[in-house]
């Protein structure tokens, strides 16, 4: 039973009373601990226990966590690790750090959370690196086309000490943000209702000339333009209607984003192009991190490591068991129930896409941004170094089998 199902058994009036008295975060964390049938009494007791546990010591620091549109329900679809991080950090520090989880776009959204963190409105945030690249453009470094051959290679890079040198340190120095952990998927094209009655896409040329919504990533636009996928910026509020009405043919994003963001009813095919990162990450203000005592900094890093390990395993399971990103699709998954077909591309089609847009095949397309990112990173070759690290493991490694490492220890 999901947290939403558990809370759904409680009236909105009673739930409002609980959240008003104990706070949203305590209520969410408590609901996640309950099993079986949940009554108002059992939930109230769990919330009270959770609240007392969280506040048994006077917190030295309260971290305001702007979690964009995430909540207890959709974090069981796309396993971004936000609540696991918050729960573990509070327990690990025995209440010295308290995390105030603010989701449902209540304080910031996918495009604004990064700036709200930089301005000090929130202390940390969760959003995709691609949507955050507007306020922190160094995050574009993850988005070179076909730099990562698999989800396993993405996780391997994030665990590697090389990620500290190539990604985390330059990002922190330039934007004042500490990159903590991230989920990992690869983006494809999510086709709307205009492809509902068409055969499942098997060739890249079937997508040529389609008009597709693009996120905030500049490098993603380069790849889409090179593949004749016509990237167009469309406000999120207009994207679902655009896919439904056929005003746009598709949108570039990843599988679990389709599921958690309620896109599944208007998506007909999930075309698995795997052409660049889909990374729902959590970062915090470097200024806030640096202001904390050493043992609390250590705790934040250890909780980040725990969250990263959790995300690696949980999201891989959720892709199959919850989202339906598999062949065959399991009954009861979101894709199966909404008739979203998985369009897997053969190796020949992926190679064609690489020939059209990858850095190795079309280096001139990437020169300007590559030079810019290399300069921000102190003169290193960002693409070559990340691609090399990503290929340190066999290409057929399963994402759940990547060995976790504490990246900051070298």
Task: Write out the residue ranges for each language-model feature.
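N-terminal secretory/targeting leader peptides
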Residues: 2-154, 179-410
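Short, solvent-exposed loop/beta-turn-alpha elements that line the ligand-binding surface or hinge
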Residues: 151-174, 205-206
